[in-house]
Amino acid sequence: MVGGLVKGYWIALYKKIRDMDNLKNYAAKVTPVIKSYGGKPLVRGGKFIKLEGDDFKRLVVWEFPTYEKAVECHNSKEYKDGWSLAKDTTERNLQIVEGT
């Protein structure tokens, strides 16, 4: 918690990726947008083991200075324009979660 504010986290579980190039183009476009809202990547892919639950292909976690900034970033025109590059070839679950 920073100055009494609750951090926000994007947690994305990618279930299907039908075009990796589209996903890479999306990431290249939105990374500067996310960082402009104070987003900091904590996890972007990497080795994992599934212990319970449904299968997924990739996990991404971004930390934001506040929950509100995380929501504001997701709802921004710049982010939505970037997501349009991958949304038709990618299935994911994306949550915004309050944290400490």
Positions of predicted regions on the chain:
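Short S/T/G/P-rich N-terminal loop/turn motif that feeds into the first structured element of a domain
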Residues: 1-59, 65-71, 75, 98-100
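C-terminal structural segments of small proteins and small subunits
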Residues: 71-91, 95
